[in-house]
Amino acid sequence: MEVAAKYKGARLSAQKARLVADQVRGKAVEDALNILTFSPKKAAVVIKKALESAIANAEHNEGLDVDDLRVSTVMVDEGPTLKRIKARAKGRADRIFKRTCHITVKVADK
């Protein structure tokens, strides 16, 4: 049985989030939580939150045992980009892209 949780509109780029997602994909839930807890990256906090939500969904909604769960899928998709303007010298302006992403974490029993 596969159970999912989604985190939409996370304020970090999909490229940076994928670096962390690759570290936990396929691991046991307990190992994945340890990796995310001690990772210094901002994406680790966001992915950990989604993983904890998926674990809670599996335990509460499906009645699965937490010790038997593993991270089956971690998908990071690009979300909408917020476009901002930064004033520069001599009346010029630069564009600033504030990127967002959608994170989907699926856990399954072994």
UniProtKB/Swiss-Prot annotation:
Pfam families: Ribosomal_L22. GO terms for molecular function: rRNA binding; structural constituent of ribosome. CDD domains: Ribosomal_L22. SUPFAM superfamilies: Ribosomal protein L22. PROSITE patterns: RIBOSOMAL_L22. GO terms for biological process: translation. It comes from the Bacteria. One of its GO terms (cellular component) is cytosolic large ribosomal subunit. Belongs to the universal ribosomal protein uL22 family. This protein binds specifically to 23S rRNA; its binding is stimulated by other ribosomal proteins, e.g. L4, L17, and L20. It is important during the early stages of 50S assembly. It makes multiple contacts with different domains of the 23S rRNA in the assembled 50S subunit and ribosome. The globular domain of the protein is located near the polypeptide exit tunnel on the outside of the subunit, while an extended beta-hairpin is found that lines the wall of the exit tunnel in the center of the 70S ribosome. This is Large ribosomal subunit protein uL22. It comes from Marinobacter nauticus (strain ATCC 700491 / DSM 11845 / VT8).
